[in-house]
């Protein structure tokens, strides 16, 4: 991306780091403190970061007059945002469902990913749940999607690591990534409440002494990350069936670069910081532990900033990616209004994941495009993120979900500058 001359004028009413939005070549870091004054900065060489306003990429010179809060809104207008679908892969043997069996859910997931790519979506992601009529074994599906698409990212949001053998998973992930040409984006996590009590026990896993199941999930994740480094760890047999390369052996197939495409699904600020320390990307969800009592999007924006701070402190050299998931429906015809026009959840909800864990569940967005655009501009977590996953009602079928995607891409995304 070329360097561009930029004149920046800011009205400052709170501490603000300009370097959070721009890579500065002549000014290493610019901190603007509240003193009630206007300050003019000449920055001869400013390079937009990946999540910086796309307008800077098009204009030779641009002048901005704003407070940090206004800047937050303007960044939403010119944003390089990766857009993906997120399917929970439900099926129900009901006449009202277009996905009435596991085969329906799997095959329609493949078809929808291909259709999403044709429409201009950037990714297709899938939720993984066990002991439920939902997608549970992601790697065959991801590999199949990889053979039917050419460009879009293919991922999960998320795989429950309490259920995973990290060695099998490293082999499966490597194979699926190679089949897709290096397009996997794997979201993993410690998991959510499941359909059965301690379901991971039926898969043969037990927490170590002093661990709970969340600790076990994080331990499995760390083992998985280590295996993806492709470093030898297994002592070779001196009399092997086939000739071994020199040194310790590692798992095959190995896919270089996959380690940098692992995301952690975080429901708290603490686990977001933990993920940053380990060099994982961040996936936020449609729910979060309620840590402040504020609306979900504000809590998630703070969570994202905590993640970035921890990432910087860890000294990683690459730029991390951050996603948010939202239910967004543009009401443009009678079908949309019939499905989502009335009774949509317009406010966050509070619930309990267990006896001690209070959680906040995000609202749905369903409105006419012009109203939707204004609502989404105010979502601070979307503004902070570089990737937006749109949860889709997969049981309504491929055709209708393609319509939902196309409506967002054509009636909402352009006005918000989502490229």
Model-derived features: where do they sit?
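Extreme N-terminal basic, low-complexity initiation segments
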Residues: 1-16, 21
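An alpha-helical appendage that flanks or caps ligand/catalytic pockets
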Residues: 67, 71-77, 207-251, 284-285, ...
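Hydrophobic faces of well-ordered beta-strands that scaffold small-molecule active sites
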Residues: 83-85, 124-126, 154-156, 184-188, ...
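Flexible, glycine-rich active-site loops centered on histidine and acidic residues
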Residues: 78-102, 163-233
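Conserved, mostly hydrophobic/aromatic
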Residues: 83, 128, 145, 176, ...
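Glycine-rich, proline-tolerant flexible connector loops at the mouths of alpha/beta enzymes
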Residues: 123-141, 286, 290-293, 392-400
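Active-site mouth loops of central-metabolism enzymes
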Residues: 92-106, 159-162, 259-266, 360-368
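N-terminal beta1-alpha1-beta2 module of alpha/beta enzyme domains
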Residues: 67-152
């Amino acid at each position: 991306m070329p360097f561009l001359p930029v004149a920046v004028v800011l009205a400052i009413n709170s501490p603000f780091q300009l370097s959070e939005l721009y890579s500065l070549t002549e000014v290493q870091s610019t901190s603007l403190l509240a003193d009630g004054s206007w300050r003019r900065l000449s920055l001869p060489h400013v390079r937009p970061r990946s999540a910086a306003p796309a307008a800077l990429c098009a204009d030779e010179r641009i002048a901005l007059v704003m407070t940090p809060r206004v800047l937050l809104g303007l960044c939403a207008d010119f944003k390089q945002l990766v857009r993906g679908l997120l399917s929970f892969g439900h099926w129900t043997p009901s006449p009202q469902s277009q996905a009435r069996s596991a085969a329906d859910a799997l095959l329609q997931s493949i078809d929808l990913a291909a259709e999403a790519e044709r429409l201009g979506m950037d990714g297709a992601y899938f939720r993984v749940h066990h002991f439920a009529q939902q997608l549970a074994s992601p790697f065959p599906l991801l590999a199949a999607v990889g053979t039917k698409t050419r460009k879009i990212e293919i991922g999960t949001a998320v795989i429950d690591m309490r259920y995973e053998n990290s060695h099998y998973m490293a082999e499966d992930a490597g194979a699926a990534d190679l089949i897709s040409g290096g397009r996997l984006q794997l979201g993993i996590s410690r998991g959510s409440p499941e359909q059965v009590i301690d379901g991971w026990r039926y898969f043969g896993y037990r927490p170590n002494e002093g661990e709970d199941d969340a600790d076990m999930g994080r331990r499995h994740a760390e083992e998985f990350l280590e295996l993806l480094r492709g470093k030898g760890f297994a002592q070779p047999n001196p009399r092997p069936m086939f000739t071994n390369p020199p040194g310790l052996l590692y798992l095959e197939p190995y896919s270089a670069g996959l380690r940098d495409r692992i995301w952690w699904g975080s429901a708290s600020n603490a686990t977001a910081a933990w993920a940053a320390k380990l060099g994982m990307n961040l996936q936020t969800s449609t729910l979060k532990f309620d840590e402040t009592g504020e609306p979900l999007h504000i809590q998630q924006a703070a969570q994202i900033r905590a993640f970035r701070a921890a990432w910087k402190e860890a000294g990683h050299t690459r730029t991390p990616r951050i996603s948010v998931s939202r239910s967004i429906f543009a009401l443009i015809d009678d079908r949309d209004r019939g499905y989502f026009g009335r009774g949509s959840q317009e406010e966050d909800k509070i619930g309990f994941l267990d006896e001690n864990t209070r959680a906040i569940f995000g609202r749905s967005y369903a409105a006419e495009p012009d109203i939707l655009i204004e609502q989404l501009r105010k979502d601070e977590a979307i503004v902070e993120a570089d990737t937006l996953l749109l949860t889709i009602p997969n049981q309504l079928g491929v055709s209708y979900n393609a319509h939902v995607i196309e409506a967002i891409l054509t009636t909402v995304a352009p006005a918000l500058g989502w490229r």
